[in-house]
A protein has these predicted regions:
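Surface-exposed binding/hinge segments that line
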Residues: 100, 144-185
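Extracytoplasmic/peripheral linker and loop segments enriched in polar/acidic and small residues
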Residues: 393-404, 435-505, 528
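Periplasmic binding protein-like
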Residues: 52-53, 366, 388-442, 478
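Gly/Pro-rich hinge or "lid" segments in bacterial periplasmic/extracellular proteins
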Residues: 90, 174-226, 230
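Long beta-strand-rich cores associated with HINT superfamily self-processing modules
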Residues: 502-528
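N-terminal lobe/hinge region of extracytoplasmic solute-binding protein
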Residues: 54-102, 133, 196-197
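Ligand-site clamp/hinge motif
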Residues: 189, 219-264
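Append "and occasionally in soluble cytosolic enzymes with long acidic Gly/Pro-rich linkers
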Residues: 296-385, 453, 481
């Protein structure tokens, strides 16, 4: 049973940390100045307008390359898929009213009658076919790695078709929740800048460079009209600015909060904080493109370095208990996930092992994109100090949102050693996350479509065998063995599963934060 989101209780007297933080902010008026100057239109939202403040820039309403969870809330309001993953992490029907496995390698699908785009044109079988082909051609796509293979479309009627695969893909109904449908004539194998979709909202204005959008009700929407007239999306990278703007009423909802900010907001008049367990894993993942002979190409060295990291202190003192240390290679909240081990802190052992492996005096570069997870900079700085204590010199490289970190992830931008990265559980299944991270092949690596260069043939074969197993119990057994095998390759220096935190004004009602760190905009209403 998936725990339901809940409101955090009002705090007791403010902690010293909170008092110091508020003192540093210097007051509402001061903070709103720079926010207003750099983040677009200001002032309290109108009575029918919902304003969202995102911590990362939403460069497109197309999800082919966008990877951060909160973007899904907005993208799905404009474009829709055949299915979606509900709050119970089970697939639900959207554009399809039938989605059934009819053989191990075929699924029968029927489009819902009357589904249409915001320009009034119908959603067609050809649009689904084109969407799958366009997603399949995008280089560097996070979503592409989730599919063991991309299905093909075989039309069987005006609204019906078969999705066929060479081998069984028993979770295809879940995977298709990631494929947003666009009119075929407007779709291309790239991140689309246009916003035509079948969702409850249409795009009124868009500035992908600034991460700002205005959405209005889609009067042609085939379903029930949403309660909110207009939605404004703003990119506000500084968390302190998001907090102040929420308190002042300039923003209605802010996502991905640190515990400090949640503590500041909980119990304030007119503000509520929501928390739910998450299905995202955040990792300090090793670069698996290192040549033979490099210390990090040796799993024993990767393992030795993990003893340098005091994960308990990071959880308690830096993340303030807003996360749980990973006990597996995927979050345990995912269906099919199993415990495979824990990260142990033992700096003496780290030093001894590194010395025995002739890997003393290592120098490593750790990179990440700002906003990858709440408190990311503080975590990275603490990790540098911990590595220093065992004789490893680490340098940090931080990328701003919207930059070229994708090239670096693919090994095209330059060399690095460890990356701070979050991987979402978009389908609620451990299998999908395992496929996306550990299903790399030599063929995928030629186009840099692997996860940080992770290509271990025996792991891929084991994963492929599990992924095509149609018997659920047998699949879970194979997946359990696979997860232990992956753990033994030591893919991460450290990893954790963050809880999902969100804050909203009291006038925002009906917002149900889901474990995938998004929510359904059609359920949100404004009161007062």
């Amino acid at each position: 049973m998936t725990p339901t989101p809940h409101l955090l209780p009002p705090p007791g007297p403010p902690s010293r940390r909170t008092v110091l933080r508020w003192g540093a902010l210097g007051g509402t008026g001061v903070a709103l100045g720079p926010l207003s100057a750099c983040a677009g239109p200001t002032g309290a939202p109108g009575p029918g307008t919902l304003t969202l403040g995102l911590n990362r820039s939403l460069v497109s309403l197309d999800n082919k390359l966008n990877q951060f969870d909160a973007a899904v809330t907005v993208q799905r309001a404009v474009r829709q898929a055949l299915t979606w993953i509900g709050p119970d992490l089970q697939p639900r029907l959207v554009l399809a009213d039938r989605f059934e496995m009819t053989s191990p390698t075929a699924w029968s699908v029927r489009l819902r009658e009357g589904v249409r785009y915001s320009d009034g044109s119908p959603v067609t079988v050809g649009d689904v076919d084109t969407a799958l082909r366009m997603y399949g051609k995008v280089n560097g796509s996070f979503l592409l790695g989730l599919f063991p293979e991309m299905p093909t479309v075989e039309a069987t009627g005006e609204r019906t078709f078969l999705l066929r695969t060479e081998r069984p893909v028993p979770v295809l109904d879940r995977l298709m929740a990631n494929i947003h449908i666009t009119p075929a004539k407007a779709n291309r194998p790239e991140e689309l800048q246009s916003g035509l979709g079948s969702g409850p909202y249409r795009v009124v204005s868009a500035n992908g460079g600034a991460g700002e959008y205005t959405l209005a009700r889609n009067t042609e929407y085939w379903g029930k009209q949403p309660p909110v007239d207009k939605v404004r999306v703003r990119f506000v990278p500084e968390e302190s600015s998001r907090v102040i703007a929420l308190r002042s009423g300039e923003l209605d909802v802010v996502d991905t909060l640190t515990p400090d900010s949640a503590e500041q907001l909980a119990g304030l008049p007119g503000v509520a904080v929501q928390e739910t367990p998450g299905v995202r894993i955040c990792q300090l993942f090793y670069n698996f493109r290192k040549p033979e002979g490099h210390p990090l190409a040796d799993a024993r060295v990767r393992h030795a370095l993990t003893y340098a990291i005091d994960g308990e202190s990071l959880i308690r003192d830096v993340l303030i208990d807003s996360a749980e240390a990973a006990e597996g290679v995927v979050p345990l909240a995912l269906q099919g996930a199993v415990r495979t081990g824990t990260y142990a802190y033992d700096p003496r052992r780290a030093k001894a092992l590194l010395k025995s492996l002739d890997a003393e005096d290592l120098r490593i570069t750790i990179m990440w994109e700002s906003g990858e997870f709440a408190g990311d900079t503080s975590v990275m700085e603490a990790v540098v100090d911990m590595l220093k204590d065992v004789g490893v010199r680490a340098s940090l490289r931080q990328f701003e949102p919207g930059g070229d970190i994708l090239k670096w992830r693919q090994g095209r931008g330059g060399d690095w050693d460890v990356i701070g990265n979050g991987f979402p559980g978009t389908t609620g299944q451990a299998l999908t996350s395992l496929q996306g991270m550990y299903g790399g092949t030599a063929e995928k690596e030629r186009t840099r479509d692997t996860y940080m260069g992770y290509v271990i043939p025996r792991i891929e074969r084991q994963l492929s065998d599990a992924a095509t197993e149609t018997d659920a119990a047998e699949r879970d057994r194979k997946l359990a063995a696979l997860q232990h095998a992956v753990w033994d390759t030591w893919p991460s220096l450290w990893a954790f599963a963050p809880k999902t935190l969100l804050a909203r004004r009291d006038r925002v009602q009906g917002l149900a934060l889901q474990p995938v760190n998004s929510y359904d905009l059609t359920a949100v209403r404004l009161e007062g």
